[in-house]
């Protein structure tokens, strides 16, 4: 897998994780988390990284971790609309 593919996969994983969080979370909690954007709560970021199917070698790249976070925020923003 190339780095570019890992970035794309990370974004998709982030979206899936964000969608699952949004489904299970109360609306007020979601608004509070979105108000803190781009700072992601550390417990959610830890779950996102630990739950990733990507090899650790890719997770060490800033671009991949950024894509995970971006996917998460994209999913949360979609639920707000």
Give the predicted meaning of each segment.
Residues 66-81:
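Short, charged, intrinsically disordered terminal tails
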């Amino acid at each position: 897998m190339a780095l570019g593919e890992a970035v794309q996969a990370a974004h998709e994983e982030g979206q899936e994780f964000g969608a699952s969080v949004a489904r299970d979370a109360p609306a007020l909690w979601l608004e509070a988390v979105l108000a803190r954007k781009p700072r992601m709560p550390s417990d959610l970021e830890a779950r996102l990284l630990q739950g990733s199917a990507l090899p650790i070698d890719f997770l060490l790249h800033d671009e991949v971790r950024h894509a995970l976070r971006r996917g998460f925020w994209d999913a949360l923003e979609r639920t707000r609309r």
